[in-house]
């Protein structure tokens, strides 16, 4: 649970969100998620059975009291915009509450879209200034976590910082994937390295490095000044991690905020939970984390709800098929509109409107919305993208060589499939993981099966006619 040192601190923390605007960077492509982001931005990817990834950042804002939010979009934004319009339009504009969509519009140049995270904010400065906020919270729209931003705002104000960066320890072997910082005993940042090849360890903890979570708080006027300076700096990549934050360390105005101070947990014994789901393996594991008996991320905490767009769907249904086999599930999440008939689902996540027909086994897999699984299929360690139809009798996840020839095989060794009709299967094999199953491939396999049956039927008809003609001629 988030704790405050005194009543005065608590009162100040409750006031600060009213002076704050949150900006969610939601324009990223997320290319490491392969075909999951072929037709949608990474923050719009489905997660946890019924949510989109961006719902976590949006819910954290509302639960923290920050009710003025800008969502900066760019790549494949239609699905994301549609989701926000349908699920996040309940805020009261008369009370100056809003979720404002900020698409890329080439405001500063007719030749460039957003060149970096800082440029994405800079190109919207005319709008952001009109929000008239004292503090700007900048968030990534593609992380899974629960955090009270009011606690971080309090830390920012009490330290007199111009900028505060949320941080979390990560294994030193993973440090090259993050922005890594060095800090003093009171968490003033003295050095910042964006994705260093050799990340410096935390003093006294050589197995971990201190990583940026991509969450920043700025004093608004100071941020505007920084962005204008950066925009006029030749050679800048216009990125917070690469340019803005490293520059501030020399000025001694930037501080780190440990995530464990503001992480929201319903059980004090649970460790702080934050996941960057930027790869297929990380995405698969984070989803299955929620299906654990005691998940580290508590989605049942009514004090900190994760909101989303709710479709009017009937409850999930588990039925006995005509042979007497019972539909059943264990250690799984099953969403509304799903029907499991005479099959077994183990340690998996079924998203809305999934249909699993008889005699199937689904193990450690993610079935995204509208997936249809034919009879007698076995799926293990798979991600099946939206609207895929798995042909009857298909087996995925049991033979590495066959899977790699048909589907994308993740770095961890599993596989995935997408809902596009044109695209090549690529992949590499490693010890663990899952399969990403592509719809275009399934269509081809299904067509081959049907073509095979069609050819056999026609051959049978031709042979029958041939023998009939032969017998007629023989009788004459």
Curated annotation (Swiss-Prot):
SUPFAM superfamilies documented for this protein: Nucleotide-diphospho-sugar transferases, Trimeric LpxA-like enzymes
GO process terms (BP): glycogen biosynthetic process
Keywords: ATP-binding, Carbohydrate metabolism, Glycogen biosynthesis, Glycogen metabolism, Nucleotide-binding, Nucleotidyltransferase, Transferase
Superkingdom of the organism of origin: Bacteria
Molecular functions per Gene Ontology: ATP binding; glucose-1-phosphate adenylyltransferase activity
Pathway named in the protein's UniProt entry: Glycan biosynthesis; glycogen biosynthesis
Gene3D superfamilies linked: Hexapeptide repeat proteins, Spore Coat Polysaccharide Biosynthesis Protein SpsA, Chain A
Reactions performed catalytically: alpha-D-glucose 1-phosphate + ATP + H(+) = ADP-alpha-D-glucose + diphosphate
Enzyme Commission identifier(s): 2.7.7.27
Binding site for alpha-D-glucose 1-phosphate: 114, 179, 194-195, 212
Disulfide-bond pairs as recorded: none
Keyword Protein biosynthesis: no
NCBIfam families: glgC, PRK00725.1, PRK00844.1
Family from the record: Belongs to the bacterial/plant glucose-1-phosphate adenylyltransferase family.
Reported function: Involved in the biosynthesis of ADP-glucose, a building block required for the elongation reactions to produce glycogen. Catalyzes the reaction between ATP and alpha-D-glucose 1-phosphate (G1P) to produce pyrophosphate and ADP-Glc.
Database matches in HAMAP family: GlgC (MF_00624)
Assembly: Homotetramer.
Protein name: Glucose-1-phosphate adenylyltransferase
Lineage of the species this protein comes from: Bacteria, Pseudomonadati, Pseudomonadota, Gammaproteobacteria, Enterobacterales
Gene (UniProt): glgC
């Amino acid at each position: 649970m988030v704790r405050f040192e005194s009543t005065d601190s608590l009162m100040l923390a409750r006031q600060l969100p009213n002076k704050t605007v949150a900006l969610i960077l939601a324009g990223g492509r997320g290319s490491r998620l392969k075909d999951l982001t072929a037709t949608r931005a990474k923050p719009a990817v489905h997660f946890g059975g019924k949510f989109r990834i961006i719902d976590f950042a949006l819910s954290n804002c509302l639960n923290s009291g920050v009710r003025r939010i800008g969502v900066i979009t760019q790549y494949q934004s239609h699905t994301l915009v549609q989701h926000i319009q349908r699920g996040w339009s309940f805020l009261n504009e008369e009370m100056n509450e809003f979720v404002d969509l900020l698409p890329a519009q080439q405001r500063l140049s007719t030749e460039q879209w957003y060149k970096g995270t800082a440029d994405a904010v800079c190109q919207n400065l005319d709008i952001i200034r009109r929000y008239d906020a004292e503090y700007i919270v900048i968030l990534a729209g593609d992380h899974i976590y629960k955090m009270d931003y009011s606690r971080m705002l309090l830390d920012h104000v009490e330290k007199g910082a111009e900028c505060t960066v949320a941080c979390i320890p990560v294994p030193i072997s993973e440090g090259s994937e993050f922005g890594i910082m060095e800090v003093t005993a009171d968490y003033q940042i003295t050095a910042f390295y964006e994705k260093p090849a050799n990340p410096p360890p935390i003093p006294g903890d050589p197995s971990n490095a201190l990583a940026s979570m991509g969450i920043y708080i700025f004093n608004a006027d100071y941020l505007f000044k920084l962005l204008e300076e950066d925009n006029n700096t030749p050679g800048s990549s216009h990125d917070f991690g690469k340019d803005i934050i490293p520059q501030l360390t020399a000025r001694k105005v930037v501080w780190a905020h440990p995530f464990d101070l503001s992480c929201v947990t319903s059980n004090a014994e649970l460790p702080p939970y934050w996941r960057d789901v930027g790869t297929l393996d990380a995405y698969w594991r984070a989803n299955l984390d929620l299906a654990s008996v005691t998940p580290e991320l508590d989605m049942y905490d009514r004090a900190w709800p994760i909101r989303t767009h709710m479709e009017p769907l009937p409850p999930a249904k588990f039925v006995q098929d005509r042979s007497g086999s019972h539909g059943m599930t264990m250690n799984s999440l099953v969403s509304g509109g799903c029907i499991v008939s005479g099959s077994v689902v183990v340690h998996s996540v079924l998203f809305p409107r999934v249909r699993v027909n008889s005699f199937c086994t689904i193990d450690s897999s993610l079935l995204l919305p509208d997936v249809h699984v034919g009879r007698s299929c076995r799926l293990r360690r798979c991600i099946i993208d939206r609207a895929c139809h798995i042909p009857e009798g298909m087996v995925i996840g049991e033979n590495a060589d066959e899977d790699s020839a048909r589907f994308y095989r993740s770095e961890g060794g599993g596989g995935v499939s997408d809902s596009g009709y044109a695209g090549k299967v690529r992949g590499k094999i490693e010890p663990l993981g899952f399969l990403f199953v592509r719809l275009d491939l399934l269509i081809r396999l299904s067509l081959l099966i049907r073509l095979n049956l069609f050819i056999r039927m026609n051959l049978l008809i031709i042979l029958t006619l041939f023998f009939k003609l032969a017998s007629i001629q023989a009788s004459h």
